[in-house]
Amino acid sequence: MQEQYRPEEIETKVQQHWDEKRTFEVTEDESKEKYYCLSMLPYPSGRLHMGHVRNYTIGDVIARYQRMLGKNVLQPIGWDAFGLPAEGAAVKNNTAPAPWTYDNIAYMKNQLKMLGFGYDWSRELATCTPEYYRWEQKFFTELYKKGLVYKKTSAVNWCPNDQTVLANEQVIDGCCWRCDTKVERKEIPQWFIKITAYADELLRDLDNLDHWPDTVKTMQRNWIGRSEGVEITFNVENSDQKLTVYTTRPDTFMGATYLAVAAGHPLAQQAAANNPALAAFIDECRNTKVAEADMATMEKKGVATGFNAIHPLTGEAVPVWAANFVLMEYGTGAVMAVPGHDQRDYEFATKYGLPIKRVIKSPEQKAYEHALEYGLGSAKNPNDFEPLTHNQRSEFLGLLTAELNKPYLEKDGETYNSGKFDGLSFEAAFNSIAAALITKGVGERKVNYRLRDWGVSRQRYWGAPIPMVTLEDGTVLPTPEDQLPVILPEDVVMDGISSPIKADPEWAKTTVNGQPALRETDTFDTFMESSWYYARYTCPQYQEGMLDSKAANYWLPVDIYIGGIEHAIMHLLYFRFFHKLMRDAGLVNSDEPAKQLLCQGMVLADAFYYVGVNGERNWVSPVDAIVERDEKGRIVKAKDAAGNELVYTGMSKMSKSKNNGIDPQVMVERYGADTVRLFMMFASPADMTLEWQESGVEGANRFLKRVWKLVYEHTSQGEAPALNVGALSEDQQALRRDVHKTIAKVTDDIGRRQTFNTAIAAIMELMNKLARAPQEGEQDRALMREALLAVVRMLNPFTPHACFTLWQELKGEGDIDNAPWPVADESAMVENTTLVVVQVNGKVRGKITVAVDATEEQVRERAGQEHLVAKYLEGVTVRKVIYVPGKLLNLVVG
């Protein structure tokens, strides 16, 4: 065995062994318990970043641990390879997206192998290949035939720079999340999948996901947004149109003082024909921000349409306004406004001088009115009231006025100003007013969802073509199965403006049943590919259909899925939805795709910048920052090599924008893959943010060197004898107890608690004890071998290259990749001694170690031999002894 730990020599050798032996390739085996460990597949951007490394290290640690438990472990990897960045990179590099993508895949694959991840590479897939997306296209046509797919013209967020539609979540402060261009509103035809048909099941089944983070489940519940309410129809004066609104607060209906419609609503469009101000407002709204965060914070604007609706219960005229906070694609494109009980409605009414009518009496309002009418009562005798003084009356009038001059938003009051519905609680008013509306034929109880159908059309090139065609007579049909896959041409020229398949009229031409037809030139949202890849991993070479159900049902559901919480309401919702679609198509038999979700925390690093000549921020890599620290290690001053004074902004997420990413490859070349992996798992709990500190990486490297050194010293002494547990001394038994307690703790930390950092800490603590342990005697060496074999196996999931080599040097049986996880010996963990605190007159004077079965007399005798205790007993008489067996001895002296 070489004396020095040299990762650059051992890691490549071990990786070659895994490749040659196909160590991590698996097949279905009904005789073994399966375990499917999956990390979210990467986008092939060109190079791995530390976020990737953290995600995949967590997955690999779990997969290797489960493998050592004897399970049949599947850990696959692939590439989420379609998407807009490839188009931009292709234009920039004067190439096409396909070669750029495939080159990146090849490079990143080598990086993943360099880190020692135990993937089944035989299952590798790339979502941009026809072999993959052909099944997605076929499935889409089947959904169309089921009525779960439709096309409609829809107002969308349009990025004029990228020439594509953006989801609401991709609009940040009114700008494109990717290129920061101002987003416009545009009406275009798009394809949708009816995720709303599954809204109730998606919501209900969250209750069955016991091992998903509550934060993710809450985010999905809120996104689905189930509500119970009433749909109400209003007639419109001087118009044959009707307005339909939905409200979850029919108890406030008698306080509706205006209606608001979207700028694109037919009634607003009709009114605009003779109203230039309204027409101008509608044009302005075409570019309104529609991301929900923006809707909540933007200035509320509106213009009166000139139309009045008729309140169906009072017959009163209610003005109709066009407002920028109402969207056609949400609900009916019209809302009723109750400014007395809604903050947004109140602000709008105040701004435009619209009536405000309160119809729910708050407890405060009720108390103030009661005091003004009856005076103040005694707490002991509430029927005994004293009239208010002049000052008290003024005070209560002020309080009442202040209360009435703001909207009351709660549901704990009672109705008033509501005619025959006065004096009712929320629930009673809800039911009574709903019943009255239903009786009049203008109301219907409904369950609504905030969730909208999934728009899957994208106006870009680098995506899977949508398999639909249009005949010359306008008939729209799914692409016939014998024409699938609709292959995206890869040998294209990118001009940075239009999609090559939109720019080439010949590509769209086809025939269906002998009739000329045009192919759809939109491509799928890339969330389509990432919504079912996990299932295709179970049978990537299967050619008879989308999935081999036998293989899929053996491996699915995924046992643990690892990825960032930023995917909570997009990918993870579509992921669940697609699984239910596949279930209903008879492809899988489970209801949910993954039993457990682990959301890893972000990786943070120091961020520095200097101010340029034009006031701009120039971000400097932390690698290039020369820093000064105070006595507590805090950065107090920094500059770069050019002498620029740097502003330190603290730790922030590694990103290109702040130039604070750390290249994993550089770290692996400097310290070795095992060191990087160990630091990633030790520096922070898996679900918390990780602060990158190279000093911590150096510490992980030093620890591995200590492990290597101890194994080297042990093996240099020759073969160790067999362990004879019965012949161990007390000290040897104590050390063996520590070994097996560590095995028990690490097993629990990795397997149940998934607190990997505490598992590593426990191994480090044990290593410190082993480093101090004697190795002269035969049983010392036998015990050391048992301990080191356990340590190497416990470290194996974290640092597999070093452990592979150390296992061989220790002459462990077979390869460590097939070795079982160490099992704690319960008998070894039994304590035969205990620590007793000794007090004299209630004050701690010492601690003694005694046998667990020691008598009180033996404990007293042992305490008297303790130097610190003995000096307090000199010349005094012990008058009383208080003994708590195995814990405390208190000697009362006088």
Curated annotation (Swiss-Prot):
GO biological process, one term: leucyl-tRNA aminoacylation
GO annotations of cellular component type: cytosol
Intrachain disulfide bonds: none
CDD domains: Anticodon_Ia_Leu_BEm, LeuRS_core
Keyword line: Aminoacyl-tRNA synthetase, ATP-binding, Cytoplasm, Ligase, Nucleotide-binding, Protein biosynthesis
Entry keyword Acetylation: no
E.C. code: 6.1.1.4
Principal location listed in the UniProt entry: cytoplasm
GO molecular function, one term: leucine-tRNA ligase activity
Matches recorded under PANTHER family: LEUCINE--TRNA LIGASE, MITOCHONDRIAL (PTHR43740:SF2), LEUCYL-TRNA SYNTHETASE (PTHR43740)
Listed NCBIfam families: leuS_bact (TIGR00396)
Family assignment from sequence similarity: Belongs to the class-I aminoacyl-tRNA synthetase family.
Protein's UniProt name: Leucine--tRNA ligase
Organism this protein belongs to: Enterobacter sp. (strain 638)
GN (gene name): leuS
